[in-house]
Amino acid sequence: MNDALYEQLVPRRQKASGILIIVLAVAVAIFGMPLVGFLSFLIAVLILMIAFYFIFPKLNVEYEYMILNHDLQIDAIYNKSKRKHMLSFDIQSAEIIAPKKSPRLNSFHPDKTYDFTSGNENADVYAVMISLDQKNSCVYIEPDRKMIEHMRQWMGSKMFLD
């Protein structure tokens, strides 16, 4: 067999909500101690420990795109240690793959949108319009040039680079 495999990691930029959670937790610890005393500090430390275990690892996310022939699999890697499968689909069943700001996408109105990009406004983001679970879906990805070439091999006239 002559399978084509390519993997790409895209680190997601930290969102404002993640920074707000960290700032809020520190503010509660600092300003709560004089008001209620040492008990407030212990409660804040306990909340920070719970947040450190459950919330903070979810703030550091990388998306891994793996394309094997025409099957695209997207995984999220949290804190560089935990992997979670997000989505997989056959790109040949996509209606169109085009840059996010392409006018070719104006006629498509997805029911559900998945965003697996870095969050950088200057990045080259592509939209994959595909039917998933009987719903029209839009999957935003951020492929590099090599992944685009792999996808073009299988997509033909349904892939646009404009």
Language model segments and positions:
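N-terminal membrane-targeting/pre-transmembrane regions
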Residues: 1-26
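Transmembrane helix interruption/hinge and helix-loop junction motifs
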Residues: 31-43
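Transmembrane alpha-helices and immediately adjacent membrane-cytoplasm interface residues
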Residues: 43-61
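A cytosolic-side transmembrane-helix exit/cap motif
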Residues: 59-71
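Membrane-cytosol interface motif
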Residues: 68-86
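Structured surface patches comprising rigid loops and adjacent beta-strands/short helices at the edges
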Residues: 86-106
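Cytosolic, membrane-proximal regulatory domains of ion/volume homeostasis and mechanosensation machinery
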Residues: 100-120, 124
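A membrane-cytosol interface segment of integral membrane proteins
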Residues: 115-162
